[in-house]
Amino acid sequence: MALNDFHVSEPYTLGIELEMQVINPPGYDLSQDSSTLIDAVKPQLTAGEIKHDITESMLEMATGVCRDIDQAAAQLSAMQHVILQAASEHHLGICGGGTHPFQKWQRQEVCDNERYQRTLENFGYLIQQATVFGQHVHVGCANGDDAIYLLHGLSHFVPHFIALSAASPYMQGADTRFACARLNIFSAFPDNGPMPWVSNWQEFTGLFRRLSYTTMIDSIKDLHWDIRPSPAFGTVEVRVMDTPLTLDHAINMAGLIQATAHWLLTERPFKPQEQDYLLYKFNRFQACRYGLEGVLTDAYTGDRRRLADDTLRLLDNVTPSARKLGADSAIDALRLQVKKGGNEAQYMREFIADGGSLIGLVQKHCEIWAGQ
């Protein structure tokens, strides 16, 4: 299939997608009733979109094109209200978190959707195992070459985005010892991790053409890279974050990515090179395993530094851009989070260490999302 031309969009505009867990109280396992919930809420939407994801226990909230994080927050808040009301009427719960802590993948029903059924045929049980929940952030770009530069620039900070959003320490009833176990689910996919190296949009179109020869790639949506260009939207999409437990944290992560994109495209602090990716997966692993306590290694010098320290440096670098975009509140909140030394994965472990159960943890997550 031919690749769409890169749609020109207003630089730094935002789109946010949140994959939510649909929960079945009182056992607090995943429900298989997302279709019922989606049908109930669609007629009530005034902005944004609520739609299926891979399995019937997943529900995706997606904003429209937003100028800033305030507009995105307003759209997501309105959708959140409608979904919670419908969920209550259907005796269901909704929550964030990158994984459900004790669901069994064998029980997950793939949505009755042509694309997902085709994906099930291609990937088998891997698709059921991919019942995990992430936040994706789109940032607008003026042209395809800017999109490729931005993708390479943002790739420097994939560990930072993972560590700040990590919220998936439990899986299949066990503590994985990872801060973010969600991304491990995709390790068996042939397109896992970073996009293969290209230096401009023309090279990317050639890459996509060759990938389509495999017969497994019909559109850009079939590529599961950590960051990918989305030519139909005119955006670059960052896909490595766990779905947060609160809407506020989701907005803060989007604000960071928007501000980082502005800094990268206006300052051009990097000259992208293929060697930039030499230690990409090692640094990504550190963030998934240890969160903000992970250690980054420089591919050129071999220097090592704590991820928390480097995240503070990133926040300082993007602060002027955040002010211009109206995202400085997000940077301030994330800076405070890093200085306190925590993420949501640590909160979850503390809940269990204090005597809580995994069932109680999911119940608490539903209460948090509902603002209780």
UniProtKB/Swiss-Prot annotation:
Instruction: Name the Pfam families for this protein.
Output: GCS2 (PF04107)
According to its UniProt entry, the protein's GO biological process terms are: modified amino acid biosynthetic process
Provide any one GO MF term from the record. glutamate-cysteine ligase activity
Catalytic reaction(s) noted: L-cysteine + L-glutamate + ATP = gamma-L-glutamyl-L-cysteine + ADP + phosphate + H(+)
Q: Does the keyword Ligase apply?
A: yes
Record note on quaternary structure:
Homodimer.
- Please describe what this protein does: ATP-dependent carboxylate-amine ligase which exhibits weak glutamate--cysteine ligase activity.
Similarity remark: Belongs to the glutamate--cysteine ligase type 2 family. YbdK subfamily.
Name of the protein in question: Putative glutamate--cysteine ligase 2
| Gene that encodes the chain | ybdK
